[in-house]
Amino acid sequence: MRKLPRPFYERDTVLVAKELLGKYLVHHDGLEEKIGRIVEVEAYLGQHDLACHSSKGLTKRTKVMFGPAGYAYVYLIYGMYYCMNVVTEKEGVGSAVLIRALEPIKNIQDRTQGPGLLSKAMRIDSKLNHRDLLSNDFYIAEPYGPTDFTIIEKPRIGVHYAKEWADALLRFYIKDNPYISKT
């Protein structure tokens, strides 16, 4: 499989989000290689986006979001679930794409419909925060075969607090894919 190159991630966050659909997320945790096809994502557009973690500025937690593109931003929610994001755009912007759901491709038996579930199924945790997605054991790759599908655009999930950003159409998923997260 061909890893996505750094310039792929250095582009506009919405474009990167849409183009991540259909790509393979690969994690080799030392025991086995797990592969999932990305079927749902959400774009977070930096400091002006009130739903984005970086909207509160540069902190220890958000530092990775302001760094170079093509790194993983992994954080814990509700004290029990990890969420995996891909840092996008140029350094200093603070943008990322949340991976919301995967279609199991290889060595995944658990549910993957939601960011916490997919992280558990793929064995993604805080040790992978700030990991370069060009590494040999954790990366995103071009899929095998054709990638024809229709992209659906909807508001992001769980960001009602984000004022005018709450209804922004920044959630993207593959139409009719059975692995998208439940709302």
Curated annotation (Swiss-Prot):
The answer to whether UniProt assigns keyword Kinase to this entry is no
State if DNA damage is listed as a keyword. Answer: yes
GO BP terms: namely:
base-excision repair
What enzyme class is recorded for this protein? hydrolase
Q: Name one Pfam family in it.
A: Pur_DNA_glyco
Residue ranges annotated as coiled coil are none
Disulfide bonds listed in the record: none
Q: What is its EC number?
A: 3.2.2.-
Keywords noted in UniProt: DNA damage, DNA repair, Hydrolase
Q: List GO molecular-function terms, semicolon-separated.
A: alkylbase DNA N-glycosylase activity; DNA binding
* Similarity comment: Belongs to the DNA glycosylase MPG family.
Spell out the NCBIfam families in the cross-references. 3mg
HAMAP family attached here? 3MGH
Q: What is the official name of this protein in its record?
A: Putative 3-methyladenine DNA glycosylase
Q: Taxonomically, what lineage is the organism? A: Bacteria, Pseudomonadati, Pseudomonadota, Gammaproteobacteria, Legionellales
